[in-house]
């Protein structure tokens, strides 16, 4: 049996602007993900391990300044 491979996914707002970008493995968020505001600015980025947030997630202001790091552990 072949191992499942991550599938890239782009989620968009109704107007077509990218809302989120990342990969899914067996239907679950897996690997690096980035989430964007409706204005296109990066809001948050981090990693998932089979649907669970892991490691350090970064949250940004609209102008790109780092607001906080949130550590979800391994």
Describe the role of every protein-language-model region:
Residues 1-74:
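Glycine/tyrosine- and acidic-biased, solvent-exposed loop/turn segments at the edges of beta-strands
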């Amino acid at each position: 049996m072949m191992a499942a491979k991550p599938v890239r996914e782009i989620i968009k707002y109704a107007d077509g602007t990218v809302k989120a970008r990342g990969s899914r493995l067996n239907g679950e968020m897996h690997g690096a993900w980035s989430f964007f505001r409706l204005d296109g600015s990066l809001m948050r980025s981090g990693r998932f391990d089979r649907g669970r947030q892991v490691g350090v997630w970064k949250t940004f202001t609209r102008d790109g300044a780092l607001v906080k790091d949130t550590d979800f552990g391994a």
